[in-house]
């Protein structure tokens, strides 16, 4: 019985950790979803549409970039900046010093804008949903994405 409990704890720990295999999978699937050019705009639109459908009040956090119209040039530029930052974080998952520097910078930017802690899990859920929809549910590993995205978001949210 003790062995079973220890095994269950190890499985739970491994699932919560962004392992090297998780990082490889997330990087590959992110590259597929992020793509280039208009693919990036489509991925961004999927993320923001999902986020705002689930958290309509979040639009107010983006008034500076015309958050009421995700198709506006101001919001599209913001969306591409967010995806660019996420792209750098995903690319740096296996380079801890670089990732930590990126996360520290993103943390200071988000702190100065007063982004509430409640918004981060919603963004993670929307980003994961958008990537899954883009790469296909059959090959998508939700545990890998959750563990690696939580590592990124915990660094941004402090």
Swiss-Prot record:
Heme b binds at residue 110. Transmembrane segments: none annotated. It is found in: Secreted. Pfam families: Globin. Hydrogen sulfide binds at residue 89. One of its GO terms (cellular component) is extracellular region. Residues 1-16 form the signal peptide. Keywords: Disulfide bond, Heme, Iron, Metal-binding, Oxygen transport, Secreted, Signal, Transport. Residues 17-158 form the Globin domain. CDD domains: Mb-like. Disulfide bonds join 18-148. GO terms for molecular function: heme binding; iron ion binding; oxygen binding; oxygen carrier activity. It comes from the Eukaryota. InterPro entries: Erythrocruorin (IPR002336), Globin (IPR000971), Globin-like_sf (IPR009050), Globin/Proto (IPR012292), Haemoglobin_extracell (IPR014610), Mb-like_M (IPR044399). The extracellular giant hemoglobin is able to bind and transport oxygen and hydrosulfide simultaneously and reversibly at two different sites. Belongs to the globin family. The 400 kDa hemoglobin consists of a spherical 24-mer arranged as a double layer of dome-shaped dodecamers. Each dodecamer is composed of the 3-fold trimer of the tetramer A1-A2-B1-B2 having one intra-tetramer (A1-B2) disulfide bond and one inter-tetramer (B1-B2) disulfide bond per tetramer. This is Extracellular giant hemoglobin major globin subunit A2. The gene is ghbA2.
